[in-house]
Swiss-Prot record:
Belongs to the ubiquitin family. SUMO subfamily. This is Small ubiquitin-related modifier 1. SMART domains: UBQ. It is found in: Nucleus membrane; Nucleus speckle; Cytoplasm; Nucleus, PML body. GO terms for molecular function: protein tag activity; transcription factor binding; ubiquitin-like protein ligase binding. It comes from the Eukaryota. Ubiquitin-like protein that can be covalently attached to proteins as a monomer or a lysine-linked polymer. Covalent attachment via an isopeptide bond to its substrates requires prior activation by the E1 complex SAE1-SAE2 and linkage to the E2 enzyme UBE2I. This post-translational modification on lysine residues of proteins plays a crucial role in a number of cellular processes such as nuclear transport, DNA replication and repair, mitosis and signal transduction. The keyword Nucleus applies. Interacts with SAE2, UBE2I, RANBP2, PIAS1 and PIAS2. Covalently attached to a number of proteins.
Length: 101
């Protein structure tokens, strides 16, 4: 009945095997681009770790933003509504904010 009507919407994503993966661009402050192919259900912690490893910097020294929203380790592309060729911006983490005069 109504339960059966609600099911197809959840299954629609599984119909296309190509839809399981998307390509994302990660752009650093120096305008360097690294492209990643990730599953829609993969935690973005993996992408962040891979990016930091390639750049040779600790993960806690950078922050990753998608459409102005900070990406947490547990976010997935699906949760954030990411699509093919979307851009993730990377910035140097800044702490503090007051002078030490």
């Amino acid at each position: 009945m109504s339960d059966q009507e609600a099911k197809p919407s959840a299954e629609d994503l599984g119909d296309k095997k190509e839809g399981e993966y998307i390509k994302l661009k990660v752009i650093g402050q120096d305008s360097s681009e690294i492209h990643f192919k990730v599953k829609m259900t993969t935690h973005l912690k993996k992408l962040k770790e891979s990016y930091c490893q390639r750049q040779g910097v600790p993960m806690n020294s950078l922050r990753f933003l998608f459409e102005g929203q900070r990406i947490t380790d547990n976010h997935t592309p699906k949760e954030l509504g990411m699509e093919e060729e979307d851009v993730i911006e990377v910035y140097q983490e800044q702490t503090g904010g007051h002078s030490t005069v």
